[in-house]
UniProtKB/Swiss-Prot annotation:
CDD domains for the chain: IgC1_MHC_II_beta (cd05766)
Localisation per UniProt entry: Membrane
GO biological process: adaptive immune response; antigen processing and presentation of exogenous peptide antigen via MHC class II; peptide antigen assembly with MHC class II protein complex; positive regulation of immune response; positive regulation of T cell activation
Entry protein name: Class II histocompatibility antigen, B-L beta chain
Intrachain disulfide bonds: 10-74, 111-167
InterPro entries: Ig-like_dom, Ig-like_dom_sf, Ig-like_fold, Ig/MHC_CS, Ig_C1-set, MHC/Immunoglobulin, MHC_I/II-like_Ag-recog, MHC_II_a/b_N
Ranges facing Cytoplasmic side: 220-231
């Protein structure tokens, strides 16, 4: 089984200030000859590539076509692609609690980050304010197919009462990191219960004050049934 392939590359420095065009010829996963616009010729990378380089360089039309690719291919496509590739997209972050079938409680947290561009991103897990690095597993950054990317970062946990977990995301599109917080369900329910009780007690206090001021105002008014002075 033999495999041959060729790749075409455009390298840009400071926009189109300096453009380099490359064509790489690969045989069985080994590059044997390539064209470099900085050189203007085909260059052999192995002994196998020497006859090919000699053949390509002996054909003026082949050389002219590859030399013209800097303008006709690289610069032309740069004007089309640059607005898309230079636009930054902010990531969206969600936390999912995962549970193994044999365990009665959550044992993993997944921080799902998607919709961001460029692909360089940093996702961190914190437990009770301390960064976790030992129990963290991450997928590669994956393309979404619309010039944006996604990544999944999973943290193994043994949740206890009072624990809090935070997923923090840093990206060039953000002025400050995004943080998503997760607490064990018991703690969340307890917090909601305490908030509900607190609100109920506060409501009773306001009700008592309202009744008190109402009664005071009634005492200060004259009784319309009391006998008055006849004029």
């Amino acid at each position: 089984f033999f495999q041959w392939s060729a790749t075409v590359e455009c390298h840009f420095l400071n926009g189109t200030e300096r453009v380099r065009f490359l064509v790489r010829h690969v045989y069985n996963r080994q590059q044997y000859v390539h064209f470099d616009s900085d050189v203007g010729l085909f260059v052999a990378d192995t002994v196998l590539g020497e006859p090919s380089a000699k053949l390509f360089n002996s054909q003026p039309d082949v050389l002219e076509k590859n030399r013209a690719a800097v303008e006709m291919l690289c610069n032309y496509n740069y004007e089309i692609v640059a607005p898309l590739t230079l636009q930054r997209r902010e990531p969206k972050v969600r936390i999912f609690a995962l549970q193994s079938g044999s365990l009665p409680q959550t044992d993993r947290l997944a921080c799902y980050v998607t919709g961001f561009y460029p692909p360089e991103i940093e996702v961190k897990w914190f437990q009770n304010g301390q960064e976790e690095t030992e129990r963290v597993v991450s997928t590669d950054v994956i393309q979404n197919g619309d010039w944006t990317y996604q990544v999944l970062v999973v943290l193994e946990i043994s949740p206890r009462h009072g624990d809090s977990y935070v997923c923090q995301v840093e990206h060039t599109s953000l002025q400050q990191p995004i943080t998503q917080r997760w607490e064990p369900p018991g703690d969340v329910s307890r917090s909601k219960l305490l908030m509900g009780v607190g609100g109920f007690v506060l409501g009773l206090v306001y009700l008592a004050l309202g009744i008190f001021f109402f009664l005071c105002s009634k005492k200060g008014q004259p009784d319309p049934t009391s006998p008055g002075i006849l004029n």
